[in-house]
Each structure stands twice: as C-alpha cells, then as structure tokens.
C-alpha cells in the first residue's frame, strides 16, 4: 500500500504579511459628498439670484480680509519715516551732532621735541578743535573748522587778529592770477579766467599781463557801444548759438597781435551786421592804442627810413672784364640800325637787294 506524501501545512509569516498588498480604500459615492439637504434652498431660486448672492458673499469676504490686514498693520509699531527722505549718511551725521551737542569741543595735545644744547625738550601744545555741524534744514559740512581760540594767542597783538566773518577766505581766480593788479585791472578781475580742468589750447595761454589788460579794455569799450547793448537785449546769453551769433574773442589764448586785431574787427563788424546797422569807422581801428605800441611802431619806422637812406647812398663798384671791352670795340665797327627791331636789325651792306646783280668792288682799296 503506497504511503501518502506528507503535505506541509500553510502558515502565514509576518514577512509574507508585510509583502501583502494593502487594503484598497473604498471611494465615496457622489451622493455621500453632496447631500440633498445642502442644496435644498437652491431648487426654488433662479440663476440670477444665485449669482447675486455669490457676489455679495465675495465682497463681504474681501471686506473682512481688508479689515484684518488693517488691524494687523495697526498693531505693529510704525517705522520712523523721514519726510525729507534723507540719505543714511545724513541721518548718521545728525545723530553725531546730537551726541556732541553737550561736548562740542575737545582738546588734543601734541608733543614736540626739540634739541637744545644736546638736551631734548618736549613741548606740549594744546589747541581746541571744534566740530561744526549745521542744522538739518541746511547742508551739512563734513569739514572740521578750527575755532578762533586755537588760532589766536591771548598775548598776541590785536593787529594780528582777524575778525571772524562769514565771507570766504578764497580770492577770485583772476586775483590769484594777477597779484599786482591796479585800477586798470578791475575789468580783468571781473572777467572769468581759465580753469584747471580746461584743456591746453594749441597756441597756449597768454601770460603777459599787459596784453591781457589791453585786450580787456578793447572788449569793454566795444561792449559800451549802443549796438552791443541792443544785441544783448535782443539775444540773451543762454539763447546764443555758436556759429550763428557773434562770438566774443577769447582773450586768454596766446594769439598774435595781428590775429587778435583781425578777430576784434570781425566781431565788431558782425555785431553791426546782426543788428542791421551800418558799421562805424571804429570797426576798422583799435579802440586802445597804448604808448608801448606807438613807441614800437615809431621805432620800426625810424629803422625803415634809416635802411632806405643807406641803400640810396650805397655805391657798388662794377669791375669790367677785358673780354667785355674787346667785344664792345668789335661791335663799334659795325653800323647797327637801332630804329629797327631786334629781329629785323641787320648789318648794313650794299643797298642792292638783288642777289643776282653784279657786285661793285670799286670802293675797295687795293693793297
């Protein structure tokens, strides 16, 4: 009798349970999500009523959200706002000014050592330095200005003390250029001078003070004319166009005397032409005629006269060569007809013009 094969009993291990498929979630039906009770009140309404109610609900929600944002904003502390929108460094300077209001001056000590007779002597000097800060309404200066106490010695003479004024200590640019200006340099000092940022012209700058004064006088006297006053009243400075309106020559450039006189004449003539007037006689002449110019021209005329007299009295001896004398004596033996032209003049021979006629030899002397 055949024995039955033993069968292994099935058992479920935790490992097999882990590998088992998860339980599928049962999906809800549409009837479970939307109940009839929730939409019972919509059954008897039209679509226009439902849309109007929806708009009212949306506007109410928007109003609630705005109220919440305003209440949240009011609950936070406001940030300090400056109406002038000042930069950060300006605000920092204002804070520094407030800190140093009570103690606006400070003292610093400087020690100087000097040697006298082999011994080193240390001298301590004190000076007061005041930090000047302007109010917030005006511009704030970053410079440190020394106070009057640091520059004035109590034992010094009163003549060395300079009263503290609000005027600037800087001189005018023309005043720095010409330190020895007199009464004639008033127009020179009032006119603008060259700046450091200007480019160097090709001809260079004019550094002769006398030339600059003379040019300034010429320009000022031309501007005193009625035609220039009319031109400035009709055409303001901001409306003048280069190449279209008369342009005043630049007196600071190192032009030659001839070039400057030509520019002045053209400028004055262009003023009359622009205003539609007839140029006067002063257009072709210079307004200023200095003594130095007169002396220089007089000296030139004297030199020219002296040179002419010397050339007039100069006698140059001409040496005749011997071959020239012999040629002159040879030509003297021939009778040249001077009444005829150079091309037609010939040596006189027989009056018989017929070459075939016999020649008369009776006048020839027999040897």
Swiss-Prot record:
Gene3D superfamilies: Histone RNA hairpin-binding protein RNA-binding domain (1.10.8.1120). GO terms for biological process: apoptotic process; embryo development ending in birth or egg hatching; mitotic chromosome condensation; mRNA 3'-end processing by stem-loop binding and cleavage; mRNA transport. Residues 206-275 are annotated as: RNA-binding. Residues 1-12, 147-156, 347-356 have a biased composition (Polar residues). The lineage of its organism: Eukaryota, Metazoa, Ecdysozoa, Nematoda, Chromadorea. One of its GO terms (molecular function) is mRNA 3'-UTR binding. Residues 1-24, 49-200, 342-367 are annotated as: Disordered. Pfam families: SLBP_RNA_bind. Involved in histone pre-mRNA 3' processing. Required for chromosome condensation, progression of cell death and morphogenesis. One of its GO terms (cellular component) is histone pre-mRNA 3'end processing complex. Ubiquitinated by the CBC(fem-1) (Cul2-ElonginB-ElonginC) E3 ubiquitin-protein ligase complex, leading to its degradation. Belongs to the SLBP family. This is Histone RNA hairpin-binding protein. Residues 57-73 have a biased composition (Basic and acidic residues). Keywords: mRNA processing, RNA-binding, Ubl conjugation. Residues 183-192 have a biased composition (Low complexity).
